[in-house]
Amino acid sequence: SIIKKAYPAAEKMTDLLDGALMNAGPIIHPPLIMMNAGPLEHFDVWDIHNEGTQPSIRSVTDSLDKERISLREALGYREPHFPLKNHYDDTLEEWMYGNSSHEKLTNSGDWREKIDLHNHRYMREDTALGLAFLCSLGRWKNHLMPISEGLLAIASGITGEILYESGRSLESLGLADLTVDEMKNMLEKGIAV
């Protein structure tokens, strides 16, 4: 294809949902901001990618990513899934951002910032839109997503909003009543206007 010629490393996606389930933001950022809420609110600036990325937080991130991959598989999507753990370990298969990307990120100092837990994009985009969407897909497919649901509940407690209701979900998009076959058909052919 013309895209493969222009971008040889590009991976072919089955459909839009396949691509959406590759978004790393809802996997990386919700654990980092929820589990670093104290330091983020206490210190003037805090680097969630450096001091904020500790073994227990990485463990939650890996568990969250396993849910994403398991959901992809339950929806019939095949590899590559680009597991996030590869971003943190250059001895594993190269991740979508390339080897050494995490080291470059933490060494840059660019991420030492003030994060407002109510309005920052990690809460508004990656959590209220991205993580809520993953939770809604899990509910729709009757696929357990306890880490996703737990982080979304904590985020709701922080913001004082029920982010599942105010965020992006199949319900808010008017797609929750579709069957799996209807969803696949819509993703392949679009919506008749």
State the predicted function of each range:
Residues 1-85:
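Internal alpha-helical scaffold of NAD(P)-dependent oxidoreductase catalytic cores
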Residues 44, 55-193:
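NAD(P)-dependent Rossmann-like dehydrogenase/reductase catalytic/cofactor-binding core
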